């Protein structure tokens, strides 16, 4: 074993000792201790998952990790917006985990790269304690499909879920706008589009599986109303959602 390897093992041993002490000193600390042991072992095997944000031994032991989901990764200034959101999360006392933060392993094809990105993002969601999802309509009248998947992933994982949107008009209203207002109620009181296809009409921000799924789990979906040219850069609704998440995660 070379000097670098020995130093790494000594560092890990010291980290484990510190975690053990904290587990003894804090009520309910053993579950968290076991959680960090798993992450530490995972880090040894797959260090690329911790390139941008190492395991947070420097942070408060009980710091909550929040996965920041949203379509911002596609923006031309993605790094700027993601960094702003991450900074706000840190200021609020949370540890942000965000797609685009971490190094993607080298691959030999586009299909393999897609799978690698999916794997990295799912690993971060597994490590996260909660999610804040940006459900602002993206390339259409509904939330980004990748963000919807991530929200469902966290719901299925039994973790706290929070979300926001920068569009105040509800889902059925946006469907109506899509068809130039040509939606109408049928004889049974069901709202339908010009093709006779039913339209969800619950006054929700998006598909009921998203909005109702969040609220059923005790989360919130903050409704913002940003200017059209700032739909993905206005962080007012995000800040409100972040404040609620911090309070509920205490």
Model-identified regions with their sequence ranges:
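Aromatic (phenylalanine/tyrosine) cluster motif
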Residues: 33, 49-50, 57, 61
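Short linear/disordered segments characteristic of secreted peptide precursors
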Residues: 8, 26-31, 44-46
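Conserved catalytic or regulatory cores that recognize and/or transform ribose-phosphate-containing ligands
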Residues: 56-250
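Hydrophobic, low-acid, alpha-helix-prone terminal segments
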Residues: 6-17, 27
């Amino acid at each position: 074993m070379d000097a670098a390897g020995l130093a790494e093992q000594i560092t890990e041993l010291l980290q484990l000792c510190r975690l053990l002490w904290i587990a003894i000193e804090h009520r309910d600390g053993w579950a968290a201790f076991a959680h960090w042991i798993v992450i530490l072992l995972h880090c040894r095997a797959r260090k690329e998952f911790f390139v941008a944000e190492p395991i947070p031994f420097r942070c408060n032991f009980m710091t909550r990790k929040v996965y920041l989901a949203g379509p911002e990764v596609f923006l031309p200034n993605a790094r700027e917006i993601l960094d702003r959101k991450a900074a706000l999360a840190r200021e609020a006392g949370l540890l942000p985990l965000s797609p685009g933060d971490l190094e993607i392993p080298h691959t030999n094809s586009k299909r393999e790269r897609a799978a690698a990105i999916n794997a990295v993002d799912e690993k971060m969601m597994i490590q996260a304690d909660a999610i804040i999802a940006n459900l602002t309509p993206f390339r259409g009248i509904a939330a980004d499909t990748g963000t919807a998947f991530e929200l469902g992933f966290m719901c299925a994982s039994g973790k706290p879920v929070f979300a926001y949107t920068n569009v105040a008009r509800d889902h059925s209203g946006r469907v109506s706008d899509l068809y130039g207002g040509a939606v109408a109620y049928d004889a049974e009181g069901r709202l339908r589009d010009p093709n006779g296809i039913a339209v969800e009409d619950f006054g929700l921000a998006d598909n009921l599986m998203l909005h109702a799924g969040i609220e059923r789990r005790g989360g919130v979906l903050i409704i913002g109303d940003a200017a059209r040219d700032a739909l993905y850069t206005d962080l007012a609704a995000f800040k409100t959602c972040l404040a609620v998440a911090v309070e509920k995660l205490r």
